[in-house]
Amino acid sequence: GFGSLFKFLGKKVLK
């Protein structure tokens, strides 16, 4: 799902 991708990207961006 798209949500999964966003969560993965968000985690990378947050760090």
From Swiss-Prot:
Q: Which organism is it from?
A: Cupiennius salei (American wandering spider)
> What lineage, starting at the top, does this entry show?
Eukaryota, Metazoa, Ecdysozoa, Arthropoda, Chelicerata
* Coarse class of the protein's main subcellular location: secreted
GO MF, any single term: toxin activity
Taxonomy, superkingdom? Eukaryota
Please state where this protein is localized: Secreted
Query: Which Pfam families does this one have?
Result: Cu (PF17563)
Q: Which UniProt keywords apply?
A: Secreted, Toxin
Q: Give me the Gene Ontology terms describing cellular component.
A: extracellular region
Q: Which GO terms describe its biological process?
A: defense response to bacterium
Q: Which family does it belong to?
A: Belongs to the cationic peptide 04 (cupiennin) family. 03 subfamily.
Protein's name in the database: Short cationic peptide-1d
State the tissue distribution.
Expressed by the venom gland.
